[in-house]
A protein has these predicted regions:
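A general structural motif
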Residues: 2, 30-32, 78, 484
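Right-handed parallel beta-helix/beta-spiral solenoid domain characteristic of secreted/periplasmic
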Residues: 2, 10-17, 52-94
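Acidic Gly/Asp/Thr-rich repetitive segments characteristic of extracellular carbohydrate-active
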Residues: 4-37
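Short active-site-proximal "capping" loops at secondary-structure junctions
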Residues: 40-43, 53
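Short glycine/acidic-rich loop motifs that flank beta-strands on beta-rich extracellular proteins
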Residues: 42-46, 67-71, 89-94, 112-118, ...
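Right-handed parallel beta-helix
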Residues: 58, 78-87, 100-110, 123-134, ...
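Extended, small-residue-rich solenoid/repeat segments and analogous flexible loops
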Residues: 119, 127-128, 237, 528-538
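Long, low-complexity intrinsically disordered regions enriched in small/polar
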Residues: 497-569
Length: 569
């Protein structure tokens, strides 16, 4: 049978004046008890030593238990607290030392301390409650939070460490100075929650943790929306991140699964995988990223299957030794490159569509920089659809370019391999090699070029096999300077000015065309570079006129006036 006790600040027949008095009597009897507390303020510390239920009979907020310093409630036995306001300073306001503790429709105000601290082996449930300023800490304990509000925590709003397990459902977390939810060596599930205005990552999985996030909204955070580091695992499903510095970040060996998420208005990056981070990302949407929608760097190695990027600066950037595989990619309406692979990075892109971007794929770096694209369409590109520079290697298979300045180009010492690719409606040409680059194209089709079909200059090498070059306004192919190569089994058709213009260093075996084929040396190389050495002032070794010079200045203003006689001053 459950014993019943009444507490009233005014006292009364069979009523206790303090809650501690009622708790003491319940502990002495050793029976389950219900303690009904009348409205009022109770400046005392409570210790639960037997199974008990504390109820504010006047409803939530009618009973305020406050201590100027130290703990307010220490629970050492199964307990339920309903409707109380617990206010403490400089200590754990609520501590669960043994058994299970449930707080319902309650409010906890923690000034310079922990709001709720669950010790190893205990269990705490927080339901329909509010926590101000302090944090909910599980150290080797189990916790469940339902429909609660956490506001202005001085550090982490909720933290689970040392093998603890936390479930947070349908709650709101706002204004935390550090993280909204922190997991360090434990497990956490965050579902149906809103997290906003956190000073660091809203949800963060630390070393060897497991984090599951589903159906959440993360907005207006100073750092990452969701972060996984140090070999942590877990998943993120159907979650939206808005106005974070980075939407989702993965680093240092972490390997989450992310599905059906939307990352909007991220100030730096949408997805950031770096420092050996991995991860599998499926059906992700990134819009309006301030710097890069998807960034992979410093050994990051994600797998992305289904990603739509719209608006913002750059699309996918794989740099500094990063690597990744990207499938079912859509990139639209950017102000910079759709795909970028630099500095010993490797990337494979399959089933790609790029629309209305300044450039498609850009690669640059040493010989360890490699990119592959298969089954792609790049259209309405302002500059080059594909550009390979440095010593990078690029392989394109079944890539179609529609309406671009240049379809495929390689310069410096880069290598570009084309298989069954096509270009239509280009301005300058279909494929280009310059510098000392090498371009090999098999099964290439170029149609409707306002310039050339293919061309090479400098000392580059251009090899074209089985190509169809149709309706190119200037000509099918041009080899200028000391460039070399071959046109094998190729056809040049249409009403262009020339079929082929070459320098005599090209193998034309199997060329089919009715247009003129002209051998002529064409030079495009610039003149010698002139180097001026300025020491304390300019040194003139010949006549100089019409020149303005300034040195040893931080700021200079130049004005030029044309006189009536045509002279300038």
């Amino acid at each position: 049978m459950v014993a019943r006790y009444v507490v009233s600040p005014r006292g009364g027949r069979r009523a206790h004046r303090t809650i501690a008095s009622a708790l003491g009597e319940a502990a002495r009897r050793g029976r389950p008890a219900v303690i009904e507390i009348e409205p009022g303020g109770y400046p005392e510390a409570l210790t639960v030593r037997s199974e008990v239920r504390l109820v504010a009979v006047g409803g939530p907020g009618s009973v305020v238990v406050e201590q100027p310093r130290g703990a307010v409630l220490d629970s050492c036995a199964p307990a339920v607290v309903e409707g109380l306001v617990l206010v403490g300073r400089h200590a754990d306001v609520v501590g669960c030392h043994a058994g299970a503790l449930t707080l319902e429709r309650s409010e906890i105000r923690a000034y310079d301390g922990v709001a709720v601290h669950a010790r190893p082996g205990t269990s705490v449930t927080l339901r329909d409650s509010t926590v101000l300023h302090g944090r909910f800490l599980l150290a080797g304990a189990h916790g469940r939070v339902e429909r609660c509000r956490f506001t202005d925590a001085a550090d982490n709003a909720l933290a689970v460490i040392d093998g603890g397990h936390l479930e947070v459902l349908g709650s709101r977390i706002e204004g935390s100075r550090i993280h909204g939810v922190f997991v360090g060596g434990g497990r956490a599930r965050v579902e149906g929650c809103t997290l906003t205005r956190t000073g660091m990552a809203a949800v963060f999985a630390g070393a060897r943790s497991e984090l599951v996030v589903a159906d959440c909204l993360v907005e207006s955070v100073e750092a990452e929306g969701i972060g996984f580091v140090e070999q942590s695992r877990g998943s993120v499903d159907r979650t939206r991140v808005v106005d974070a510095r980075c939407g989702i970040a993965v680093a240092s060996g972490a390997d989450p699964v992310v599905r059906d998420c939307v990352l909007t208005g991220c100030r730096d990056t949408g997805l950031d995988v770096n420092g050996g981070g991995r991860g599998r990302f499926r059906d992700i949407e990134v819009s309006g990223a301030g710097n890069v929608a998807v960034l992979v760097t410093r050994g990051g190695a994600p797998e992305v299957d289904g990603c739509r990027v719209t608006g913002g600066t750059a699309g996918f950037a794989v740099t500094d030794g990063g690597r990744g595989r990207f499938t079912r990619i859509e990139v639209r309406d950017l102000t910079s490159a759709a795909l970028r692979v630099h500095d010993e990075a490797t990337a494979v892109f399959e089933h790609v569509r790029v629309e209305r971007c300044p450039s498609g794929l850009e690669t640059k770096g040493n010989g360890g920089t490699r990119a592959e694209i298969g089954d792609a369409v790049l259209c309405d590109v302002e500059m080059a659809a594909v550009t390979a520079l440095g010593q990078s290697w690029v392989t394109l298979r079944r890539v179609a370019v529609e309406r671009a300045a240049l379809a495929f180009g390689a310069g410096e010492e880069a290598q570009l391999l084309l298989e069954d690719c096509r270009a239509a409606g280009v301005g300058v040409g279909g494929a280009s090699a310059f510098g000392t680059a090498r371009v090999v194209a098999r099964g290439l089709t170029v149609s409707g070029s306002d310039g050339l079909g293919v061309f090479a200059r400098d000392t580059a090498r251009l090899e074209v096999v089985g190509a169809v070059l149709a309706d190119c306004a200037v000509g099918g192919a041009t080899f200028a300077d000391r460039s070399v190569g071959r046109l094998a089994d190729c056809s040049v058709t249409g009403e262009g000015q020339l079929g082929v213009l070459h320098n005599g260093l090209v193998d034309l075996g199997g060329l089919r065309t009715t247009l003129p084929v002209v051998e002529k040396e064409v030079r495009t190389e610039p003149g010698p570079t002139v180097v001026h050495h300025h020491y304390e002032g300019p040194v003139f070794n010949g006549p100089v006129r019409d020149v303005q010079l300034a040195w040893n200045n931080i700021h200079a203003v130049q004005n030029r006036t044309t006189n009536e006689d045509g002279t300038r001053t």
